[in-house]
Amino acid sequence: MPEPTPERDRVCYFLGAGFSSAFDLPNTTVLLTRVHALARKHSMPLERHLKDAYKFFYPEESASFIPEVVDFFSVLRAYEEVGKGVPGAFEHPALLTDLKMAIARILCEEVRETQLPAGGWKTVGEIIRKGNVIVTTNWDLMVEFYAKHMSVPMRLGWEPNEEYLSVIKLHGSVDWSLKKELRTGASEYVALRQLQNTPRAYSLPIVNEEVVRIQALENMNRNWQLIKAHTTRPHMIVMSQGKSVEMEPIRPMWTGAYSALSRARELQIVGYSIPPDDIEIRALLRAGVARGPEPAQVVVHNPDPSVHMRVRTYVQQSARSEYRPFTVR
């Protein structure tokens, strides 16, 4: 017999880059520009390596050309799979790793510098609260940082519980690492699903864990330094077409997201543009909200009318629209 359809009793939020942008974090379109600025400021070889990559992968473009972010990540990821080590290939094989590290540094430093009021913000508090479920594609630590600041009990992954916030990160995080990528001597890391922001946090075994969380949140003053010292490569799934290989180590996050969306009576999509080529997210959202005889009510928060059209095309025709951008207040 098939399993019974679960009751829709949860409030879920799907957060995209527009949510983080409300805190002045960089969105997807400006990431490469920000990486160039970081590299120039610190005289990093990454600046030259990126320009070499643009010339190699986009030979017809001008010297000032900076590619579209998703396309560039797709090219680099494909190169890692098929071109690495081939004679005459691109001369900086570690570029994707270096790029992830630079982005992690930018996001860590900017979250750390965010000034949170003692009482928080009403609009953010409606999202980051006990009993809610957050599903996000964002790599940054803003949700976790705010939850810690407001002492909101939180767990990464999905378990139905009114006593804590569930946060499901579909693209990984700046503070996650494959265990095999941990540096020798690394010690400050825990299981992803370990409960956070509680008086008594019980340590969970990590023997069978493929991905772990570096304890950057517990050390915000040196969050980036801790990540750099603990992993050779943060587990951040790049924005590219065909993410299935990178998704596999965090498959429980994806299955958990489906379970959570299947339980959602209301799904608020905040700051996510649902690009047509993001097939995995489209399929996940559609499957989750449509499961069972009573679909979830979808509400879209985005100033761009084309986003609302895509949600109605790909996710739910009856989705409600809020055209005001998300703001912290």
Mark where each language-model region is.
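Conserved catalytic-core helix/loop/strand module for nucleotide-ribose chemistry
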Residues: 2-266, 272-329
